Amino acid sequence: MGRILIADDHDALRRGLARGLTEAGHEVDEASNGNAAIERLHEGHFDVVLSDLKMGGSDGLDVLRTARTLHPTTAVILMTAFGTVNTAVEAMKIGAFDYVQKPFEIEEMEVKIEKAIEMRRI
């Protein structure tokens, strides 16, 4: 299992996702906005970061750039309800591991996280 940071300004989604991933055996930390996520990245390493694209303060692309700089092996999965193809392409070019449209099922996210953790080990 892995150490995961969830950054999302929608409390219910963030807490529900954290609960599901904790029950699946992951160690989970939460950030309610992009600035808090960047602060957590400065404090330590995560195997996977799940970040909302649109948040107050720094956005998901800022979180992605910070993760790439501080922890190049950390997989970042961006989540959004309002994304476009151009945004997805930009995120992948910057180094996102994956890009997920909301709403999604927890099982879908668990598979993506496991794949990200496996890829880190190769």
Predicted regions and their residues:
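Active-site residues of response regulator receiver
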Residues: 8, 52, 80
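The feature encodes the CheY-like receiver
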Residues: 14, 56, 84
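Charged docking surfaces used in two-component/phosphorelay signaling
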Residues: 15-23
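Short hydrophobic/Thr-rich beta-strand motif most characteristic of the beta2 strand and flanking loop
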Residues: 25-32, 40
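Acidic catalytic/metal-coordinating carboxylates
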Residues: 32-36, 59-62
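Short amphipathic alpha-helix used as the core "switch/output" element in two-component signaling
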Residues: 39, 61-72, 90
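Active-site beta3 strand of CheY-like receiver
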Residues: 45-50
